[in-house]
């Protein structure tokens, strides 16, 4: 499938139209097991028909008028139940209003195909869901492999060509991880960049939103639409772009992940980028803080879900999710206060350390693991989840916007990813840099 920008260009030229694009998406979605929790076909057809009429009249609402997209089932859509991937919410009241982001993209003319699957309550980086099924990674041709999570269905919906864009959320890596494992672009915004009104939360300090796409230009276009901007972006030369390659973690990642990243670095250097290879003291200190004092998201997720854990509905939770939530029940408040205090200092330290550069790391240390052993073995699930989240958690803790880009494949054809990150609030600069980096890697 082409990206959303190319699809919209076809609408403008008359080579295709939104109704045709939607029907293809609905057909593919209906034949893709466990990718969607629900389809919003009636709404989508109304939106597509209206968009097609606007294109015929030469009056599109935006460059993406009529482009189909999917929403992780944490976003409220009026008339639909927001399940959060949890069995106990199957019969929750339907949302009365669209989430703020849903409304903005709807007013730009985009067509909402449905709501995608996810790890229950968005609380795993692997994407397994025993209630609604686990979406299969499209690259797992030898045997079923994990999609990555928690935005599992959103990633697979794009990677499998059902839709060109799907919205996700990211608290510890939930956009960036599935993007890397499915060969996509995944953009985690700074937590305050978009309104989270109408989005089911996990950890208020760390939750962020963003798209999974097939190109950086599509991610930039979504960012513009969510800020009610209309502009066209052209990749600038990467010459002079400063990057810091975090060397300290490279020994810990799979050879294919490391080799593909280093190959990308050589391409960028050849194109004129200034790449400094060294350990990042702030990144390493953040890894150490998480290891020693625990994950801020664990404190906040327990506080949010304690009423659920203390209710009869807790019996309906995936036991693995329930155990992970319960593990934070006994954590002392002093530990939380310490993490928050150090976090603030590290955020300022990062700004000073990078001094305008972009941090470059692997997104995930490995390619997508085989699914069956993780379904069968609780200990393997826990250790693999921690390993999968390890390299994205520091960026989340420091609220760093991040863009995961495809960096290549391993010998089996499984995707690897690299991660570009910047200090909190520097999303626009990061996205421009990602567009330039992508243009080099694609050539």
Q: Where are the language model's segments positioned?
A:
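Short helix-loop capping/hinge segments that flank enzyme active sites or metal/cofactor-binding pockets
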Residues: 65-87, 240, 295-347, 404-414
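Serine-dependent amide/ester hydrolase catalytic core
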Residues: 8-12, 24, 303-397
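Residue-level signal for inorganic ion chemistry
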Residues: 25, 44, 219, 243, ...
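Immediate post-signal peptide segment of exported/extracytoplasmic ligand-binding proteins
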Residues: 51-68, 235-243
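Acyltransferase
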Residues: 15-23, 49, 99, 256-279, ...
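Structural helix-boundary/capping segments
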Residues: 107, 160, 164-251, 262-271, ...
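An N-terminal boundary/leader segment
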Residues: 1-46, 53-56, 266-272, 443
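Short glycine/serine-rich loop/turn segments
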Residues: 64-206, 246-248, 361-380
């Amino acid at each position: 499938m082409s990206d959303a920008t190319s699809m919209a260009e076809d609408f403008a030229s008359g080579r295709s139209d939104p109704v045709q694009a939607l029907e293809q998406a609905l057909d593919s979605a209906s034949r893709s097991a466990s990718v969607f929790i629900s389809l919003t076909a009636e709404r989508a057809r109304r939106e597509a028909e209206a968009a097609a009429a606007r294109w015929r009249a030469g009056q599109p609402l935006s460059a993406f008028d009529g482009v189909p997209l999917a929403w992780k089932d944490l976003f409220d859509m009026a008339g639909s139940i927001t399940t959060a991937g949890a069995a106990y919410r199957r019969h929750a009241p339907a949302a009365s209003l669209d989430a703020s982001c849903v409304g903005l993209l709807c007013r730009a003319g985009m067509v909402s195909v449905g709501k995608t699957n996810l790890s229950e309550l968005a609380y795993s980086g692997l994407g397994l869901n025993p209630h609604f099924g686990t979406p299969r990674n499209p690259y797992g041709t030898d045997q079923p492999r994990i999609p990555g999570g928690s935005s599992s269905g959103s990633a697979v919906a794009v990677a499998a060509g059902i839709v060109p864009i799907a919205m996700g959320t990211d608290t510890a890596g939930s956009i960036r991880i599935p993007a890397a494992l499915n060969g996509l672009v995944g953009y985690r915004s700074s937590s305050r960049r978009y309104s989270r009104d109408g989005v089911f939360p996990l950890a208020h300090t760390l939750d962020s939103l963003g798209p999974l796409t097939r190109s950086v230009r599509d991610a930039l276009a979504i960012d513009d639409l969510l800020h009610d901007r209309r502009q066209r972006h052209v990749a600038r030369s990467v010459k002079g772009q400063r990057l810091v390659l975090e060397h300290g973690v490279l020994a810990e990642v799979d050879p294919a992940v490391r080799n593909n990243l280093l190959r990308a670095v050589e391409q960028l250097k050849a194109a004129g980028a200034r790449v400094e290879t060294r350990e990042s003291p702030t990144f390493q200190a953040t890894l150490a803080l998480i290891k020693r004092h625990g994950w801020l998201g664990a404190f906040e997720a327990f506080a949010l879900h304690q009423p659920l854990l203390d209710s009869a509905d807790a019996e309906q939770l995936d036991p693995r999710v329930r155990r992970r939530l319960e593990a934070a029940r006994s954590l002392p408040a002093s530990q939380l206060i310490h993490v928050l205090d150090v976090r603030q200092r590290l955020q300022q330290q990062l700004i000073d350390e990078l001094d305008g550069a972009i941090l470059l790391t692997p997104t995930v240390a490995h390619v997508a693991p085989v699914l069956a052993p993780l379904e069968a073995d609780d200990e393997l699930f826990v250790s693999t989840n921690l390993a999968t989240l390890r390299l994205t958690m520091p960026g989340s803790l420091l609220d760093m916007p991040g863009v995961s880009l495809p960096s290549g494949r391993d010998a089996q054809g499984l995707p690897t990813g690299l991660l570009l990150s910047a200090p909190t609030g520097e999303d626009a600069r990061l996205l421009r840099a990602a567009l330039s980096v992508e243009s080099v890697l694609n050539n």
